[in-house]
Amino acid sequence: MMNTMSSESKKQKRLSEEVCKELYAKYETPERVIKHCRAVGETGARIASALNKAGYNFDVSLVRAAGLIHDLMRISDNHGEAAADLLESLGYVQEAKAVRNHMRYEFNAPENITETDIFCLADRLVKEDEYVGIDERVDYLIDKPGKTAERTKILIEKREETKIFIKALEIRMGVKIDSLFRNDDSAKKIDRLLKRVEKPARYIGSEKNICKKKPQNKLRFAFAFPDLYEIGMSYMGLQILYNILNKEDEIYCERVFAPAQDMSTLMCEEKLDLFTLETKTSVRDMDVLGFTLQYEMSYTNILDMLSLAGITFKSKDRAEDEPLIIAGGPCAYNPEPLSDFIDVFLIGDGEELLPHFLREYKKSLEKGVSKREFLKSIVKTDGVYIPSFYDVVYNEDNTVKEYVPLIEDAPKRVKRALISEIEDIPFPERPMVPFIDTVHDRAVVETFRGCTRGCRFCQAGMIYRP
């Protein structure tokens, strides 16, 4: 990744907090505005520091100073211009540049971000004197006196643009911006709950041969098995895909399983989000959440897991800053029962399709591309079915009659993804070793895929017929 110093970050005369206090007094800045400025300064500084940990070299003091002084003349007309002119006259050139257009600022492309981008982002995430995030901040602005349909439309458009920009920063930081400001005591909650549940080893992680990575500049993928740990850890496909994905430098695959009823109840009581085993990260903070669909009886568990994670159920209602929800596995060949809840189905063999899909999504996040635009770019790929791009026509007996594409590039028939040679699959040489007995507590060997018999009632026999 780039690690060049921002053009704004060369050291010049820097505005101190003491000078800010003097200017507040001189220009009679209201106390509530001063508190807001301080909150913006600290918010921007925290984001800049997180980016620096990921390899950037931003001037944190400049970001903080711009926040501290940006609303100095809030009670004046064109307060940004007025404050910038004053700062320039005092020799604070960089602060003046950042402050001048902060009300109408257009973010740079993610690869060209500067201290001004970070400060202006922070200003959009703070309401009054506290960090609240982009949704609450925009809702607050929409409901202010003078509300009009046109202003509301503009604010909503700006909110979506800001969310895309935030996602581009988060993929570089390896953490969600919200998590930088969350009073996160999840680890302590988990430790407390483990003493109160049956089989706590289901939730510990740290098994032999698991993968631990630094999350910076990684696409974070939660591999979700919608059933208990001891069932999911028996699944050879999890071992194969976990091994393949974590060999990719730009992807970090972590695991999550459906908690047992005792743990699920306690998580709801303690307001603890569903978390990954490897890093105990909230699943809602992942970039992609992928479910393996092994049997239909697990479908209600998928909804339970979405609920525990705090993720919106229906795909059409899901926000830009929520994870992309994907699903694969044998039941993905009949996607319609879950089509309202899944953004993308990956149909067929996943050993090549899933890494390719995740690599492409990471590129789109880094470029600041919206989810919908990314999905449009990937829709022609074999094995990719995107329910929102199709209208499903049913027969009288409720069987599917046809799929009608709603966008030009969507193929009328989605082809499954296939691996031509099973010998080419990189099976794990060091499989994960569970802490507790699994339902199939033995070594697994895959000799071939499918079935040579081809019985009409058997999915495996029909899917892999030559």
For each feature predicted by the language model, list its residue ranges.
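Divalent metal-dependent catalytic cores for phosphoryl transfer on phosphate-bearing substrates
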Residues: 26-29, 36, 48, 52-148
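A short, charged/proline- and glycine-enriched loop
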Residues: 214-221, 284-287, 438-441
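Core AdoMet radical
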Residues: 223-231, 251-262, 287-299, 442, ...
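Radical SAM [4Fe-4S] cluster-binding motif and immediate context
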Residues: 420-466
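Charged phosphate-binding loop/patch that engages nucleotide di/tri-phosphates or the phosphate backbone
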Residues: 150-184
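Low-complexity, highly charged intrinsically disordered N-terminal segments
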Residues: 221-226, 232-243, 247-260, 265-267, ...
